[in-house]
């Protein structure tokens, strides 16, 4: 499947109706989701026939993309029932048999799913405002769940901090791409229509 085809497919995925600020629910755009998944699939062969987890899956754009690219099974994990209702609606719309969903607090599931997945993909909360450090909790959980690789988005400004953590956790960290994440003005306190954030697309692998 070409990148453009994947992107236009992901444009059909319904997003958040009322994003929740406490959960830092910012949508992953079809463009960014498409670029991530296309690279994971074509460069690293970490989706097709693999067991894939999507942490903080929200309405499911990464999960659905992974399922469309023939993941053996993709399981989305999220705490928010409203987002998961939209996720389930999207799955029905796409008629995908290789996708499942679990409602849970992502930060508390690592031990239950230790090394149960080949690949973990995620666009975690950036850990700003109310949730300082949650990005690292997501990452630590993801690393504990994956046997092959974790793919994640993180603010470029936190790269040195993440590298230090990766060294502590004895995982290899590779910045695959630097992306501009267009953050839509989805909350009332956002003054501008949208804000560009520099984001690293990172691959973590066991050493």
Curated annotation (Swiss-Prot):
Q: Which Pfam families match?
A: MTS
**Binding residue positions for S-adenosyl-L-methionine:** 25, 28, 56, 59, 61, 78, 105-106
- Keywords from the named record: Cell projection, Methyltransferase, Nucleus, S-adenosyl-L-methionine, Synapse, Transferase
Q: Does the keyword Ribosomal protein apply?
A: no
Primary localisation category: nucleus
Q: What reactions does this protein catalyze? A: adenosine(1832) in 18S rRNA + S-adenosyl-L-methionine = N(6)-methyladenosine(1832) in 18S rRNA + S-adenosyl-L-homocysteine + H(+)
Does Nucleus show up as a keyword for this record? yes
List where in the cell it is found.
Answer: Nucleus; Presynapse; Postsynapse
As recorded in UniProt, its EC number(s) are 2.1.1.-
Give the phenotype of cells or organisms lacking this gene.
Microcephaly and curved tails.
- The source's domain of life comes to Eukaryota
UniProt xrefs under InterPro entries: DNA_methylase_N6_adenine_CS, rRNA_MeTrfase/Polyamine_Synth, SAM-dependent_MTases_sf, Small_mtfrase_dom
PANTHER family given in the database record: RRNA N6-ADENOSINE-METHYLTRANSFERASE METTL5 (PTHR23290:SF0)
Family to which the UniProt record says this protein belongs? Belongs to the methyltransferase superfamily. PrmA family.
What does this chain do?
A: Catalytic subunit of a heterodimer with TRMT112, which specifically methylates the 6th position of adenine in position 1832 of 18S rRNA. N6-methylation of adenine(1832) in 18S rRNA resides in the decoding center of 18S rRNA and is required for translation and embryonic stem cells (ESCs) pluripotency and differentiation.
| Protein name according to UniProt | rRNA N(6)-adenosine-methyltransferase METTL5
- Organism, per UniProt? Danio rerio (Zebrafish)
């Amino acid at each position: 499947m070409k990148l453009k085809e994947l992107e236009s497919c992901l444009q059909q995925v319904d997003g958040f109706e009322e994003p929740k600020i406490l959960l830092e629910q910012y949508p992953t755009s079809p463009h960014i989701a498409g670029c991530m998944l296309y690279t994971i699939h074509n460069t690293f062969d970490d989706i097709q026939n693999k067991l894939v987890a999507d942490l903080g899956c929200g309405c499911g754009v990464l999960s659905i993309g992974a399922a469309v690219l023939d993941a053996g099974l993709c399981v989305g994990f999220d705490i928010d029932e409203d987002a998961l209702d939209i996720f389930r609606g999207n799955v029905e719309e796409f008629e995908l048999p290789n996708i499942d969903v679990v409602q849970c607090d992502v930060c508390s599931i690592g031990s239950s799913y230790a090394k149960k997945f080949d690949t973990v993909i995620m666009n975690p909360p950036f850990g700003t405002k109310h949730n300082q450090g949650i990005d690292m909790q997501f990452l630590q959980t993801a690393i504990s769940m994956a046997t092959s690789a974790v793919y994640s988005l993180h603010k470029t400004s936190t790269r040195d901090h993440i590298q230090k953590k990766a060294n502590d956790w004895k995982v290899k960290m590779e910045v695959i791409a630097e992306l501009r994440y267009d953050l839509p003005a989805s909350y009332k306190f956002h003054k501008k229509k949208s804000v560009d954030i520099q984001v690293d697309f990172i691959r973590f692998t066991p050493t």
